[in-house]
Amino acid sequence: TEIAEIQKRAVQLTIFFAILAIGLMALSPELVWILGGTQYESGKYVAIPLILSAFAVFIYNVVVPVEYFHEKTMYIMIGTAAAGVVDIVLNYIFIMRYGFIAAAYTTLVAYICYAVLHFFIARKLSGISILPFKVVCFIVVLLLCMAALNLVFISSVIIRYFACAVVVIPMGLLLLKRLFKEKNQNG
């Protein structure tokens, strides 16, 4: 069915974006150093939560078209405003105490709220999930574990790259296998 095809593509895109996010998290300290030099070295602690924020925005962009389709754009405005309020309140509480690094984490929390809210709104409106809940949960837990590992071992290139390879290679092979299988079935 058309819905099943959309769900399949959404899962494939989510896996692809997760692979990118995991790779970027592993590379982020070196990327910060290459792009900013030693004077921006503390930025390596901001990169990982910002990469996770980008993933949350990706999830939002996968599910929000359902709200447009059902012409319920008021929900988009409400969700955006709610996430903005969460971000402002958290920034007010944490930035003065913990500095600019806190801003990355408050942004992450706000974007997670944004994505979760719209995920459930879209599911309520359509009666189905564009992205299966179990898939999203698995990938989010995987990303959070990889983020924690990358932060704990931020000074160890070998551990970060090895962990990235252990996760990304099987995910990439699985995705490619599914894409080739699909291509062969469709001629």
Per-region residue spans from a language model:
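Membrane-embedded alpha-helical segments of multi-pass transporters/permeases
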Residues: 21-26, 34, 46-49, 88, ...
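Membrane-helix interface segments
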Residues: 42-43, 72-75, 100, 128-132, ...
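Transmembrane alpha-helical segments of multi-pass transport proteins
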Residues: 83-86, 132-183
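Membrane-interface helix-loop junctions in multi-pass transport and translocation proteins
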Residues: 74, 80-116, 151-166
